[in-house]
UniProtKB/Swiss-Prot annotation:
GO terms for molecular function: RNA binding. InterPro entries: NusB-like_sf, NusB_fam, NusB_RsmB_TIM44. This is Transcription antitermination protein NusB. The keyword Electron transport does not apply. Belongs to the NusB family. It comes from Lactiplantibacillus plantarum (strain ATCC BAA-793 / NCIMB 8826 / WCFS1). Involved in transcription antitermination. Required for transcription of ribosomal RNA (rRNA) genes. Binds specifically to the boxA antiterminator sequence of the ribosomal RNA (rrn) operons. Keywords: RNA-binding, Transcription, Transcription antitermination, Transcription regulation. Gene3D superfamilies: NusB-like. GO terms for biological process: DNA-templated transcription termination; transcription antitermination. GO terms for cellular component: cytosol. SUPFAM superfamilies: NusB-like.
Length: 139
């Protein structure tokens, strides 16, 4: 089973969403359920899936601190939809810690995740936040 990076990001989002609800869940078992729902033989977990999920979890406090300044004064991380926050964490992680993912790709993939797992308002919100990030990086 060979997954594209886009599919891996979708699985990473699903894993992080599940781990948000149950932080003590076993990551590897969760990966197996996401990758092989029929529970036949164990499948090899793509390295990039593990990198994203483990990285976002390990750097969550740092990522949240980086996201907060891009929110309007009326918003805090606690007010964000969990889907939006998880997608932003993945994007910020890729932007900061994954060298072989161009900024444009990280932003586009975050918007695609929002289209798949959230609504149009969330897509506009995530796009706006990441647009500010890109503008800041250019300056």
């Amino acid at each position: 089973m060979s997954l594209t990076r886009h599919e891996i990001r979708e699985k990473a989002f699903q894993a992080l969403f599940a781990l948000n609800a149950n932080p003590d869940a076993d990551e590897n078992q969760l990966f197996q359920q996401l990758l092989n729902p029929e529970e036949t033989d164990a499948v090899e977990i793509p390295a990039y899936l593990s990198t994203l999920v483990t990285g976002v979890r390990e750097h969550q406090v740092e990522l949240d601190a980086q996201i907060q300044p891009y929110l309007s004064q009326k918003w805090s991380l606690d007010r964000l939809a969990k889907t939006d926050l998880i997608i932003l964490r993945i994007a910020f992680f890729e932007l900061q810690f994954v060298d072989d993912v161009p900024t444009k790709v990280a932003v586009n993939e975050a918007i695609e995740l929002t289209k798949a797992f959230s609504d149009d308002r969330s897509r506009k919100f995530v796009s706006g936040v990441l647009g500010k990030v890109v503008k800041n990086q250019a300056n």
